[in-house]
């Protein structure tokens, strides 16, 4: 089961070596993208997948698929920020997930 924005500021438990996927909506055509601000005790990959849209339509959004893997036992944490890389702002949206790795 994938995690979504509904899981923001929650804690999950996974086994060492187990993968979990976080799916967050975004639209990089606006200049904003989900970036990993910090990641402790976990490995991660981020991939953007655009939503299907009619030919010739620009500016469609999509979903960011962030895969995390428990690499060390103990408490891990990932913080993602939805921002324009060239203009960080204190009001940028964040997604934080604590992960207990067993």
From Swiss-Prot:
Q: Where is this site: Important for the redox regulation of cysteine protease inhibitory activity possibly by regulating oligomeric state?
A: 39, 58, 60
Q: Where is this motif: BC loop?
A: 27-32
Q: What is the effect of changing residue 29 to S?
A: Increases inhibitory activity towards model target papain
Q: What outcome is recorded for mutants in which this gene has been deleted? A: RNAi-mediated knockdown causes an increase in peptidolytic activity.
Q: Which UniProt keywords apply?
A: Cytoplasm, Disulfide bond, Protease inhibitor, Thiol protease inhibitor
List, alphabetically, the GO terms of the cellular component aspect: cytoplasm
Cite the effect that the entry attributes to residue 39 to S. Answer: Increases inhibitory activity towards model target papain
Q: List, in alphabetical order, the Gene Ontology terms for molecular function in this entry.
A: cysteine-type endopeptidase inhibitor activity; enzyme binding
What domain of life? Eukaryota
Family annotation (InterPro entries):
Chagasin-like_sf (IPR036331), Cys_protease_inhibitor_I42 (IPR052781), Prot_inh_I42_chagasin (IPR018990)
What kind of modification does the protein receive after translation?
Answer: During oxidative conditions, cys-39, cys-58 and cys-60 react to form intra- and inter-molecular disulfide bonds resulting in the loss of the protein inhibitory activity.
Q: In which compartments does the protein localize?
A: Cytoplasm
Instruction: Give start-end ranges for motif FG loop.
Output: 85-93
**Motif DE loop in this chain: where?**
51-61
Principal location: cytoplasm
One Pfam family name is Inhibitor_I42
How are the domains described in the entry? The BC, DE and FG loops form a tripartite wedge that blocks the substrate-binding site of target cysteine proteases. The BC loop interacts with the catalytically active cysteine and histidine residues of the protease catalytic center.
Instruction: Spell out the subunit comment.
Output: Monomer. During oxidative conditions, forms homooligomers; disulfide-linked. Interacts with cysteine protease CP2. Interacts with cysteine protease CP5.
What function does this protein fulfil?
Cysteine protease inhibitor. Inhibits cysteine proteases CP1, CP2 and CP5. May protect the cytosol against cysteine proteases released by damaged intracellular vesicles.
For this chain, the family text in UniProt reads:
Belongs to the protease inhibitor I42 family.
Q: What is this protein called?
A: Amoebiasin-1
Which species is this record about? Entamoeba histolytica (strain ATCC 30459 / HM-1:IMSS / ABRM)
């Amino acid at each position: 089961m994938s995690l979504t924005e509904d899981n923001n500021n929650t804690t999950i438990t996974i086994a060492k070596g187990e993968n979990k996927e976080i799916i967050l909506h975004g639209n990089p055509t606006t200049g904003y993208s989900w970036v990993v601000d910090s990641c402790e005790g976990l490995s991660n990959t981020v991939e953007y997948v655009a939503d299907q849209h009619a030919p010739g339509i620009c500016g469609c959004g999509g979903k960011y698929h962030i895969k995390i893997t428990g690499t060390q036992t103990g408490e891990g944490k990932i913080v993602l920020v939805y921002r324009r890389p060239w203009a960080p702002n204190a009001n940028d949206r964040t997604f934080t997930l604590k992960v207990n790795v067993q």
